[in-house]
């Protein structure tokens, strides 16, 4: 999966993002647009991804929320999916 990344962060942040993206690729249907990664002003890493339908976006968000919880528990880095329907 191709991803656009535009942020600077610690090695831990990059590792957390890599883990999140690996799970995103394996657990949910492929987004219809290239996901974009941005660092929010709040320090959260957002992965914006467009899906074909609201239902697919909702399901992807639910699945990846579990991954986000595991990652933040292990690393104190919050990476979240910001899904939307295209």
Predicted feature descriptions by range:
Residues 1-15:
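N-terminal presequence-like segments and adjacent domain-start helices
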Residues 16-22:
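Acidic-basic catalytic patches of nuclease active cores, encompassing PD-(D/E)XK
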Residues 22-33, 71-76:
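Short secondary-structure junctions
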Residues 26-46:
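Short edge beta-strands and adjacent turn/loop segments
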Residues 45-62:
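A short interface-forming secondary-structure element
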Residues 58-74:
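An amphipathic, aromatic/His-enriched active-site/gating alpha helix that lines ligand/cofactor pockets
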Residues 69-86:
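A short amphipathic beta-strand at an alpha->beta junction
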């Amino acid at each position: 999966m191709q991803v656009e990344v535009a942020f600077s962060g610690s090695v831990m942040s990059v590792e957390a993002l890599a883990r999140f993206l690996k799970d995103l690729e394996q657990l949910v249907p492929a987004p219809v647009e290239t996901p974009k990664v941005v660092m929010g002003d709040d320090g959260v890493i957002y992965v914006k991804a467009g899906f074909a339908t609201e239902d697919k976006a909702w399901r992807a968000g639910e699945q990846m929320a579990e991954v986000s919880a595991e990652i933040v528990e292990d690393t104190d880095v919050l990476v979240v999916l910001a899904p939307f329907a295209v």
